[in-house]
Amino acid sequence: MKFFVTGVGGQLGHDVMNELLKRGHRGVGSDIAPAYSGVADGSPVTRAPYVSLDITDRQAVEKAITEVNPDAVIHCAAWTAVDMAEDDDKVAKVRAINAGGTQNVADVCKKLDCKMTYISTDYVFDGKGTEPWKPDCKDYKPMNVYGQTKLEGELAVANT
């Protein structure tokens, strides 16, 4: 299969892309930097095709995914600086990336009939449960901006 992986400059996207390539899949990575800027560890992701992409730009998302023409998109891109996300001057940007950018990816995948996997976080819950979460648990209680915006991303995908 051919995958398009967003956020390959980060830890999760880097590892997801490496695992896909290790298993013999083809992949194109993306992140906001002009060129791959993740860990320079010589792993396959560092040599894989790369597309610079700002997921908050709907037209750019559509152009990139259309041109790559993947069988599936694995959406790992996100604002992940949890503490910095709480800064008043950062909240709109965090929401634009984690909710709006995710909505853009979901909309384009739906339009192109392309499978999409969205990676969220346990920060959508408050961590005060006494039992493991059950599949499709909807007991959301985000306690910070990061968790709230990732939940907004989950809901964007679910409602697209």
Where are these regions (language model features)?
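N-terminal Rossmann NAD(P)H-binding glycine-rich loop of SDR-like oxidoreductase domains
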Residues: M1-R23
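SDR active-site strand-loop-helix element
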Residues: T6, S30, V73-A77, M116-T121
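Rossmann-fold NAD(P)-dependent oxidoreductase module
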Residues: D15, E19, V108, A156
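Conserved glycine-rich Rossmann-like NAD(P)H-binding loop of the short-chain dehydrogenase/reductase
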Residues: K22-G38
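Helix C-cap/helix->beta junction micro-motif
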Residues: R23, V68, V108-L112, T160
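Rossmann-fold cofactor-recognition segment
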Residues: S43-R58
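NAD(P)H-binding glycine-rich loop region in Rossmannoid oxidoreductase-like domains
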Residues: I55-I97
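Catalytic helix-loop patch of NAD(P)-dependent Rossmann-fold dehydrogenases
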Residues: A92-N104, K111, V124-T160
